[in-house]
């Protein structure tokens, strides 16, 4: 059964929010990525991951951007989407290492579809990533 494994929030100061969630809720930092001078921080509670994404669209609201499902077989999900007359899912850019695809629900809410996810070796190609053992 597909499982929600991450939420992504748009925020003004991802590093400050990361510190807040780590100190108050004991979340752990998984990684961070800086692109075009903006830093995104990725946290986990060991079960759900929280992506704190830097606001880059001036005047746009902060808040929930998308959520992500971990699935065993993305082709099965694609077939189910067709039954709902939903085109997609679309492949994510290769530099987006935590999810292979993105789609929307009937109201346009975005979600990621990943056969891998945050619990994998980032050096291994997508769809072949083995879980990281601690």
Which stretches of residues belong to each language-model region?
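N-terminal beta-strand motif that seeds the catalytic metal site of vicinal oxygen chelate
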Residues: 1-18, 64-67, 117-134
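Core segments of cupin and vicinal oxygen chelate
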Residues: 2, 8-50
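Vicinal oxygen chelate
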Residues: 3-12, 41-44, 57-134, ...
């Amino acid at each position: 059964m597909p499982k929600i494994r991450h939420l992504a929030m748009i925020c003004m100061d991802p590093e400050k929010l990361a510190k807040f969630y780590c100190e108050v809720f004991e979340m752990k930092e998984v990684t961070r990525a800086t692109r075009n001078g903006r830093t995104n921080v990725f946290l986990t509670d060991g079960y759900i991951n929280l992506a704190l994404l830097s606001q880059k669209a001036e005047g746009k609201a902060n808040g929930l951007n998308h959520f992500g499902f971990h699935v065993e077989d993305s082709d099965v999900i694609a077939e189910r989407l067709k039954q709902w007359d939903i085109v997609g899912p679309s492949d994510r850019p290769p530099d987006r290492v935590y999810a292979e695809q993105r789609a929307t629900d009937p109201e346009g809410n975005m979600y990621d579809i990943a056969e891998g996810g945050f619990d994998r070796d980032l050096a291994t190609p997508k769809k072949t990533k083995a879980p990281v053992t601690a």
